[in-house]
Amino acid sequence: MSRKTVSRTFSSFSISVVAVAVASTFSAHAGKFNPKFLEDVQGVGQHVDLTMFEKGQEQQLPGIYRVSVYVNEQRMETRTLEFKEATEAQRKAMGESLVPCLSRTQLAEMGVRVESFPALNLVSAEACVPFDEIIPLASSHFDFSEQKLVLSFPQAAMHQVARGTVPESLWDEGIPALLLDYSFSGSNSEYDSTGSSSSYVDDNGTVHHDDGKDTLKSDSYYLNLRSGLNLGAWRLRNYSTWSHSGGKAQWDNIGTSLSRAIIPFKAQLTMGDTATAGDIFDSVQMRGAMLASDEEMLPDSQRGFAPIVRGIAKSNAEVSIEQNGYVIYRTYVQPGAFEINDLYPTANSGDLTVIIKEADGSEQRFI
């Protein structure tokens, strides 16, 4: 009885050792598939290269994929992109097997400041560029299971969109319209004048008496007229007045002007009767043409003066700006150099303290 028990125990132990050894051997070698199985029966089929799939489970074939594009954690759009096999250097730097084929035009559409990197201009606008090698700390990650491409660029390499900005593509010139703004006032008055009384006899012997009272009437009218015409981007304006007094009428044309917005310059072009701005010196009436900046085209954060803050983040970081102990600005930046140029102008005095809080919890402070 004792022998059987010992024998069973020994047998079970032997099987376990063999099973572990087999499992260890299986996991230590990469799986291979004989491509001969994919050829036809007569052996004349094309040779199939499966070495791509022997590099790991994350390996995917290069090709064209429709993906959702995220730039610095912000979803941009869904588009069809070509993906190429990553080079050995790209595999080591980003751990990616596929990298997107992005042209200079596509990078510009995503907000990258391509003009700041001369190497990007050495190739044609539609050719693939190794942006991760040209732009420091730029990277890409392709999530194949979710068909999502995540691109990361240093904040300083991106065009900054100031807070409150409305894209110019959404600006509207308005509808054609005829405008009329008027103000009218008038008065009627009557009064009696008293003179000396008199009497006289006419040829018929009738006696007439004059009590010396006369009734006087006075009418006065005034019209202030501001009219205009909107047609496309053009604005026609006229300012005129009309007055009537003492039986006489007078029409005065004070001024007529034609203006339109010049969007690339964020300015207004005015021709005709106009006046200079009176912000610093007295306003001067003039007749001619004037091109002047229009702050209404700028977001609130771009009106007035505010300093530009520059720094370098070591990781995905939170950047806060304090003044007199109060946080007046906070944003999040990618690794690399960053630039903050959309601070709201403030009338308060005091130094600005910049606090960079890294992903590991460490902080940098500078004034």
Swiss-Prot record:
GO terms for biological process: pilus assembly. Part of the lpfABCC'DE fimbrial operon. LP fimbriae may participate in the interaction with eukaryotic cells by assisting in microcolony formation. Could be involved in the export and assembly of the fimbrial subunits across the outer membrane. It comes from Escherichia coli O157:H7. The keyword Transport applies. Belongs to the fimbrial export usher family. GO terms for molecular function: fimbrial usher porin activity. Pfam families: PapC_N (PF13954), Usher (PF00577). Induction: Induced during the exponential growth phase. GO terms for cellular component: cell outer membrane. PROSITE patterns: FIMBRIAL_USHER. The keyword Cell membrane does not apply. This is Probable outer membrane usher protein LpfC. It is a multi-pass membrane protein. Residues 1-30 form the signal peptide. Keywords: Cell outer membrane, Fimbrium biogenesis, Membrane, Signal, Transmembrane, Transport. It comes from the Bacteria. It is found in: Cell outer membrane.
